[in-house]
Swiss-Prot record:
It catalyses: methanophenazine + reduced coenzyme F420-(gamma-L-Glu)(n) = dihydromethanophenazine + oxidized coenzyme F420-(gamma-L-Glu)(n) + H(+). It comes from the Archaea. This is F(420)H(2) dehydrogenase subunit C. The gene is fpoC. Optimum temperature is 39 degrees Celsius. GO terms for biological process: methanogenesis; methanol metabolic process. One of its GO terms (molecular function) is NADH dehydrogenase (ubiquinone) activity.
Amino acid sequence: MDARTIIESLTGKFPEAISEAGIESPIRIRAYVDKDKAKEVCEYLKGSLQFDHLCSVSGVDYPQRDELEAVYHIASYDHPVVLMLKARLPRDSPEIESVVSVYWNANWYERETYELYGIFFKNHPELKPLVLPDDMLGEWPLRKDYEGFPNRTARNLV
């Protein structure tokens, strides 16, 4: 299955949920997904299109647009294609359904994204800090408005 066929399948199955789908290169495709359909789209990708490997989950902060993005890189062992699936989230309440039940390895990726960007993954089995100390929870150090040193928390760490 080539990139064009994958995009056609996604947009055909989820016409209201998939937008801005395109081919970056013969082996790289991208698409935006409605945040409320992201888990369902991931289930379809894995179950019907053989996108069986979640490579990463991360975040991107766009303060000028007042939003964050949850970014998923999903690959297929059957097709030489990697899909970058993005979901736009409001910056003041960035929530999206966890995909741990679809891709087990999303567990730590989502935890890291939560503690660094503040993206809340609903129904995550154990959404707690992964690498940062407990007193930094709520600081969201990878957001662009994070003040860094010498803010209150960073000063206490040194």
